[in-house]
Amino acid sequence: MDQQPIQVIGGGLAGTEAAWQIAQAGVPVILHEMRPKRFSPAHHTEHLAELVCSNSFGAMASDRAAGLLHEELRQLGSVVIAKADEHAVPAGGALAVDRGQFGQDLTQTLASHPLVEFRRSEVPAIPEGIVVLATGPLTSPDLAADLHRFTGMEYMSFFDAASPIIVGDSINRDIAFMASRYDKGEAAYLNCPMNKEQYLRFREELCKAEQTELKDFERETAKFFEACLPIEELAQRGEDTMRYGPVKPVGLSDSRTGERPYAVVQLRQEDKAGQLWNMVGFQTNLRWGEQKRVFQMIPGLEKAEFVRLGVMHRNTFINAPQLMLPTLQFKQRPTLLAAGQLIGTEGYTAAAAGGWLAGTNAARLALGKEPLALPPTTMLGALLEFISSASPKHFQPMPPNFGILPDLGMKIKSKPERYGRYRDRSLADLSSWKHNLN
C-alpha cells in the first residue's frame, strides 16, 4: 500500500526545512506555497525560504546563541543552513547570504527531490492526516480563521519591520569606509560616520518624520518585537538610544583619520557582487518619501538610490505554551505539527530549526516511530522547551539566547568562558543524543 504523503503548508524557512527532512527520511511530502498566486504583505518573490527582513542569520561564532544554533543545525543536516553557508556574503562575524541565490537554490533543490511534490496553491483549511503548519506570521486569512476555530483561541501579535536596501554605486565611498567592528574578520561593512552635530540633526528629523498610519484596530494593539524596533521608535526613546543600539560607534574607527565617530550607520552587503547594501538596524515604518528625505541626511548617503524602502507588517502567532508540545505537535491533535514564527520562535535560524524538528517528527509518525524532543541543554531543545512551557499569559516570541539554557551548575564570571561552556555542553549532548537515535 502506498504511503500517504505528509502535507507541509508554507514554503518559508520552516516549511522548506520540514519538507526536506520528511523527504530525506524516505516519506513522500506535498509542499504547499501560495506564492505567486497570492502574496503576503512582506513577500516579493515566488522563491521558497524568501528572507523578508534582513539577509543575516546572526552571529557565526558558536559561542554566540545564533552561532551555536547554526552549528547544531549543521550537525543535524539542515538544508537551510547548508545553503546559507554556500551562498554566504562578507558580513564580518555574521552569517549573511545573497538572498536571491539562496532562495533560488533552495527552490530548485526541493523541486528536484523525487519525494517532494511542489504545489503552488493556497490551502484554506487544515487538511486531514499528518500535517506541518509553517505558514508564518502572515498566514492567509482563510487558513488563519480555520486555525482559530481549531484552537478556540485568539491570535497574539506584534509588529515587525524591514530595513531599506541601497544601490552600492550610489554610496559615497569618499565618506563611507569599510570596516568590521573591533576589526573582527575581514572588513565587511560600509560605515557612514557622523559627528555629534550631524547625529543630533538626523535624530531630530527622524523624530519629526511622518509615519505610515496604522489601522484603528492595529493602533490599539500595537506592540513591537524589541529586537526589531523601528529606528524612529528608538530615536524617540532618548537622545542616545540609537547610539547604544544600531548606530553605536564602539569598535569602529575611520582608518583615514584614526578617529572614532560620534555615531556610525552600518551597511551590510546583500549580494555576492556587492551591488546592494542593507541599512543595518534601520527597520522603519516611515512614509517612503520621508525615508528618502531623512536617510539621505546620513553622511555618504546623500545620493543614495533605494531599491527597497522599509516596510512594517503585523505578525501573528499562536499561544504555543497552551497548545504545543516540545515535539512541536499540537496537544489536541498529535498528527498536526507546527514550526516557525507562527508558534513564536523568533528569527531565521530558529524557524529553520523548528522546521527540522517538525519535519523529522512528522516523518517519524508516518513511519510508526515515536516523536523526538531534543535535549534541553541544546539551544534548539531549550528554545522549544521554552515556547511549550512558558507562561501562557505573558507569552511573547523568543529568539535563541543563552538565558533559556539550564544552569551550568557552577559560577563562571567571565561571559566568554561561560558561553563557551554552554557551547561545549550543547554540542556534546547533541552528539550523544544523535548517536542513540533509532
Swiss-Prot record:
InterPro entries: FAD/NAD-bd_sf, MnmG-rel, MnmG-rel_CS, MnmG_N, TrmFO. FAD binds at G10, G11, G12, L13, A14, G15. It is an enzyme of class 2 (transferase). PROSITE patterns: GIDA_2 (PS01281). GO terms for biological process: tRNA methylation; tRNA wobble uridine modification. GO terms for cellular component: cytosol. Keywords: Cytoplasm, FAD, Flavoprotein, Methyltransferase, NAD, NADP, Transferase, tRNA processing. It is found in: Cytoplasm. Its EC number is 2.1.1.74. The keyword Cell membrane does not apply. It holds the Pfam family GIDA. Its main location: cytoplasm. It comes from the Bacteria. GO terms for molecular function: flavin adenine dinucleotide binding; tRNA (uracil(54)-C5)-methyltransferase activity, 5,10-methylenetetrahydrofolate-dependent. Its cofactor is FAD. It catalyses: uridine(54) in tRNA + (6R)-5,10-methylene-5,6,7,8-tetrahydrofolate + NADH + H(+) = 5-methyluridine(54) in tRNA + (6S)-5,6,7,8-tetrahydrofolate + NAD(+); uridine(54) in tRNA + (6R)-5,10-methylene-5,6,7,8-tetrahydrofolate + NADPH + H(+) = 5-methyluridine(54) in tRNA + (6S)-5,6,7,8-tetrahydrofolate + NADP(+). Belongs to the MnmG family. TrmFO subfamily. Catalyzes the folate-dependent formation of 5-methyl-uridine at position 54 (M-5-U54) in all tRNAs. This is Methylenetetrahydrofolate--tRNA-(uracil-5-)-methyltransferase TrmFO.
